Amino acid sequence: MITAANLHRSYSIGKKSIEILHGVDLHIAAGEKVFLCGPSGAGKTTLMYTLAGLETPQEGKVAIDGTDIYALSATARSVFRNRNMGFIFQNYLLMPELTALENACLASSIGRRPRVEYVTELMERVGLSHRLNHLPSELSGGEQQRVAIARALANDAPIIFADEPTGNLDRKNGAEVLDLLFGLAAESRKTLVIVTHDEHLARRGDRIITIMDGQAV
């Protein structure tokens, strides 16, 4: 469960201060698939980063399963984030010198099963068992995003944050990637928080939160 109360976030540009988030309140239940939508520059990504503990608000509170993440030290917050969150980004962020499997292993932690064994299983689930030893440059955009999905799921975190995960893909590949993410997340009832400008894709979630004029509406 994610709860945000009275979030304010602003940036300084020259001598001007521009407020991106203006008193945002929201509640996301465990297992929900929520899309953050709104026009360019509305603050969708800023809100996601603030909910994830990556950008500190000037005012307000974010609680995840009752833990006030901004009351934690920076080190404790990083540990909490690594245990509880996975991330998928529009530009994949794969290390060019590492294989697909090695990239997918980067965010994982040793759990009940050996790490490489578990991640290899995830790579099979995302349809890349034949591409484990390929470099990112040898993969299509859709395949690279599948690696990113496996990486986000590798530490078995209960929350997945995704920033425009289909933004660099065509409509068909984007829908396939979203289907894959939804299916894998549903198996362990993960919470999905997805930033998108594509309202067609957003309609497939449980709920759409629109960011307008710095507020969630």
Predicted features by range, described:
Residues L98-L106:
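Short coil-to-helix segment of the ABC ATPase nucleotide-binding domain corresponding to the Q-loop/switch region
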Residues I160-D163:
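Catalytic Walker B motif of ABC-type/P-loop ATPase nucleotide-binding domains
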